[in-house]
Amino acid sequence: MRREVSAVVAVAALLALGGCAMNPVAPLPTGAELDVDLDVGPRASFVDAGPDGVRVVDGDDWTLPDRVRPAEHSGLFSEEASADDLVAVRSIDLSWRQVQPEKGAPIDRAATGEAQGMSFDGLDAQLGEPGAFWMRLFASGADWAPEWVAEDCAVDSYGPDYDGQRHLPIWDECVWGHLMDTYRALFADTGLAADPRLRFVYVPGAFTWAEYDYEMVTAAVEAGDLDEESYLAWYAHAWDDLVELFGENAHKLVFTGEDYPFGPFGAADDLLARQAVDAGMGVRTGITELANFHLSEAPAYRSSIQPDGHLVVDESLPIHSGDFVVATENECYTDCGYQTDDPYYSVRQSNLKALQLRMNWMYVVPGPSYMAEYPEHWDWVRLSLGQTAETSADAWAAFRDAEDRYWGEEEFPRAWDDQPWVRNLERWLVQVDEPGSVAHRTEVDTHVADLEEDNGTAHEGLSTSVADGDTGFVLDVDERFAAASDGQGTVLKVTFLDTGNGAFRVETDAGDSASVVRTGSGEWRTATIALPEGAVGADASRLRIALEGIDGVEAATADDLVVRFVRVIRTD
């Protein structure tokens, strides 16, 4: 029988009255302000088109206009704040055993704790540190949970997990009820949920690293102790319990599970992450480092694969309203058991994937995340997180074909012409195939099994094919971005492989741009191209990168052009 979560409705009412509890508790410690100004624009000077309408630089160009500032409700977070890296949100980590070692006892705010090989100061000591914070309550581990829980609920632990830890079954109604009592005492009764310094909380506090995977669920099923019906019955109310408990602060809850988990229930568990989000929580993934794998079809983020292989994000739904946390973690490139020979490539692609999913928060560790090595790129990421089509300074498309190996063996629920190949990563700018402008796969920049085998093969860049009559690339600008660009200056940044003869220009309804002449350097270069006035606006959203031949006119005499990345930028 379900153990009822006590006093949930009453708590919601109390939260609405300001977070007071039935019994007075000592005020929470208030740390000093962190000495860091987050309202900082680009740290690198913007590369404009210059007086001739075209400026070309070597390599990638991540620069943004000086006016750009971070989006509200967005940022970088980590275990420790780093003012130099503009990481201003630190963690407060606790174990369940630490804060409630005795059944029915008040929250112990002085006791220390440990989990995952980490040692934690007491709650009050951590609250007394400067700056905003995010939180994890490590709850499920047999060594994280209070000893009395397993005895009171008469449950066994499962495991070990891949980190050697055994876990209690939090889906057990008795265990879950006790955990909800602790969440209520910790976050509602103390007023911690309403603390403006608290940015968000990872929930539910299970399993390895408090990340909700299905390794332990599968172990319980294989042991004969759990079936689909029982699990889904618990799951159906679990997230409502948390949302109701947090009340008006429920937007701070972040579910740590994933779409299409590697679970034991087949199709029955495919969409459970979306169910948690639909209950009124944010969501987080921890594996955008594997930028090609398992996150193309992501219902919790409202990202879906189209029949032509492009990815579309439905931003009309609450998860992308700006009120919720949509987070990822990008720090495992030459860490966490991963390895790459090209860390810049790995960092770049993982961040493009995160932004394609419209993330507003990103966990980083400055060293392993290579922030010092690639400062301009990370600055662009910081200023892109949480932006919308209306507020973003740029819209972009990364031209590529990459296989999502998860769907190499799974049956996809809809039409997908070239399964498992995904075309491009796009954010308010879509590359469109049409007669005379069909983009072709190229092998000039191919990566295989970057970080690990699951990441598959990726062909970076797409090519024209003069022999097939395809002499350009058509771009469709999101109508919201275009409308917000009305009356503003715009440039197009095109990262291209500087090989072959000929030039290219940008064709718009307002006229053509100046030409970019290839020099045959054999390197990736980025051209910043001034667009004619009115090229992008409420009634103008189509652009075409067009080849020019040796004579400057006849495209058929040009060599093929490979393009890897395109950005439309509002300069005003």
Question: PLM features: residue spans?
Answer:
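Glycan-recognition and processing domains
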Residues: R400-A483, D560-R567
